[in-house]
Curated annotation (Swiss-Prot):
This is Acetyl-coenzyme A carboxylase carboxyl transferase subunit beta. It catalyses: N(6)-carboxybiotinyl-L-lysyl-[protein] + acetyl-CoA = N(6)-biotinyl-L-lysyl-[protein] + malonyl-CoA. The keyword Aminoacyl-tRNA synthetase does not apply. The gene is accD. Pathway: Lipid metabolism; malonyl-CoA biosynthesis; malonyl-CoA from acetyl-CoA: step 1/1. It comes from Methylobacterium nodulans (strain LMG 21967 / CNCM I-2342 / ORS 2060). Keywords: ATP-binding, Cytoplasm, Fatty acid biosynthesis, Fatty acid metabolism, Lipid biosynthesis, Lipid metabolism, Nucleotide-binding, Transferase. Its main location: cytoplasm. Its EC number is 2.1.3.15. The keyword Lipid metabolism applies. One of its GO terms (biological process) is malonyl-CoA biosynthetic process.
Amino acid sequence: MKVETMNWISEVVRPRIKTLFKRETPENLWVKCPETGQMVFHKEVEANDYVIPGSEHHLRMTAQQRLKMMFDQGTWLDVPLPEVPVDPLKFRDEKRYVDRLKDARAKTGMMDAFKVGFGRVGGLPMTLAVQDFGFMGGSLGMAAGEAFVRGAETALDKRTPYVLFAASGGARMQEGILSLMQMPRTTVAVRRLNQARLPYLVVMTNPTTGGVTASYAMLGDIHLAEPGALIGFAGPRVIEQTIREKLPDGFQRSEYLREHGMIDQVVHRRDLKATIARLCGLLMQAPAAEPAEEEAEPLPA
């Protein structure tokens, strides 16, 4: 009898007491800094545009968060994006591609890795395209290529600057050659912006790599980057394994690339909006009219 009583106390009463006094704590209440290990209350991080106070480490942002941060009053018009065939290659690795797409859409609430918005930034009409790394690593596929081109067409139609926030691991392997085709297609779209004399600015965020770096991310009139962003074609680990040498400290980080002339400026996230508005304002000014050549008067005989 005594044994049964003890079992009842240990198996039934104690767990109920623990549950009664247990305080529910959401898993995402605190954010850990990847650099210092510092724990920061999530509301502080959100209020600081997802930059860790103290270490100034720039966390990744969703496309929605990025657009809200950039546009005046946090309001903009979503640009409708074209629909593309889903999984035309019927690709499967460990998992079917269509299932990977379903999971990514459920996780992010997006149809693919790109969002395009039109609105005002610092009072200037502007078209912004944002890649979301949370959607299959921001990989470039048919949908992303179509979205980039539609953003460029919107900028052409409305005569606005086109600003891209790049965040990608590269081309989407599940779409094979159809993914690689987006590299020349996006390059042609950038060329059309150049011909129309409209500014195209690229902001490289962490990470910007692979086929995205080999195409539209490196074709801007001005290249900006967030602090500490990884930027390159192949990652540093792959390069080290290939050349069998240790890479320099900070190799492929935005500060290193700035020192070596690959990008124009490293800009803290809090200064991005003002910097982009200022640059676009300068670039959109019409060139001064050249003075008309006066017809030479005939010399007296």
